[in-house]
A protein has these predicted regions:
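C-terminal cap/linker of serine protease catalytic domains
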Residues: 142-208
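Alpha-solenoid helical repeat scaffolds
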Residues: 228-229
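Conserved active-site neighborhood of the chymotrypsin/trypsin-like protease fold
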Residues: 13-92, 117-123
Length: 252
């Protein structure tokens, strides 16, 4: 496949959870993260996404470096440092918080808690969307949003808002995740996962449905549902041998 988008982000845990911009994931069937040292990680699951603020939470395979996430709101007139990523020449740019607004989002994967949204005095370079703003203690405070032209100001959404997102496969949140063919994180409860599997079949994208089926099989390899569903998909596409292999697993 071809590259459809790039962005920045940060790891928010040592076990592979990360936050970034949502737009590059839309229409993607695969994503790879490259950290500041040049190490690559495959994205193996989407957790949640918010298309209003254009952010998402996802998971990569393997252990990861992590940035501490600020739990408090940074007051106006404070200094924040924009960490501009580059494997060759990373740099920090100074910014001043000119205004702090608050927002809350109640819905699938989101708690309804109030979070800060920052307006900053800073001349932002190009191609730094979703780079983190950090405080003097090194905590990740916010993710910078894309800027058009040289305005001298920029907006940034709370890292904690994105980090707090929970796994979602039902409701509007599921519809948003269905815009990507990267598999969502399957619910740990088998009954919930069965519901998610059925609902995924009603989504518009067959690629998304196929990715959900694969995620279900990985999460519940001893259950027959996933193999039976994949067998039907393979048979519909003319893969008789593959369908037969799946049905053999299902009845074993």
């Amino acid at each position: 496949g071809s590259l459809i988008g790039t962005s920045h982000g940060i790891f928010v845990s040592s076990d592979g959870y990360a936050v970034s911009r949502w737009k590059p994931f839309v229409g993607a069937s695969k994503a790879v993260v490259v950290d500041a040292q040049g190490k690559k990680y495959d994205v193996d699951a989407l957790i949640s996404a918010n298309d209003i603020y254009d952010v998402c939470k996802f998971h990569v395979a393997g252990n990861t470096p992590t940035a501490p996430v600020a739990s408090n709101t940074i007051p106006e007139k404070s200094t924040l440092w924009l960490s501009c990523y580059s494997v060759r020449a990373p740099r920090l740019l100074r910014s001043t918080v000119s205004k702090v607004e608050s927002f809350s989002v109640t819905g699938s994967g989101e708690s309804g808690t109030s979070y800060p949204f920052y307006i900053l005095d800073i001349q932002v370079p190009e191609d730094i969307d979703c780079c983190p703003l950090i405080d003097d203690a090194g905590n990740a405070v916010a993710l910078i949003q894309p800027v058009s032209g040289k305005t001298g100001t920029a907006n940034a959404v709370s890292v904690k808002f994105v980090s707090d997102m929970q796994s979602v496969m039902l409701g509007q949140g599921a519809n948003t995740l269905a815009l990507s063919a990267i598999p969502p994180l399957m619910p740990s409860d088998y009954n919930d996962a069965q519901i998610a599997l059925v609902l995924a079949g009603q989504q518009r994208s067959p690629e998304y449905y196929a990715s959900v089926v694969e995620s279900f099989i990985r999460s519940f390899p001893q259950k027959t549902d996933g193999y039976e569903t994949r067998a039907r998909l393979r048979l519909a596409s003319g893969d008789v041998a593959g369908a037969d292999a799946d049905m053999t697993k299902a009845i074993a």
